[in-house]
């Protein structure tokens, strides 16, 4: 896999789980002999929802909720076959969404 990069994009609602998963991927890649660029923190997506507090009246009384999606980007430069195998066998936290592009 010479001259090829692996781009890994991670998404999660909890930044602590996301950072732990990022550290795990970086240590696995470095242990197998690949060099890593990143992690690059991408902009956090904030979705806000505004709802009425009461079911019937009082339009002025509202409540706001927000959902934050944290993102990180990793580039693994010149991965070895051992790196690819180790990344496939890696078990990450349940709340982390992983997108891999070759």
Curated annotation (Swiss-Prot):
Organism expressing this protein natively: Agrobacterium fabrum (strain C58 / ATCC 33970)
Name by which UniProt lists this protein: Small ribosomal subunit protein uS10
Protein's job: Involved in the binding of tRNA to the ribosomes.
GO molecular function: structural constituent of ribosome; tRNA binding
InterPro entries named in the record: Ribosomal_uS10 (IPR001848), Ribosomal_uS10_CS (IPR018268), Ribosomal_uS10_dom (IPR027486), Ribosomal_uS10_dom_sf (IPR036838)
One GO cellular component term: ribonucleoprotein complex
Highest taxon of source: Bacteria
Signal peptide: none
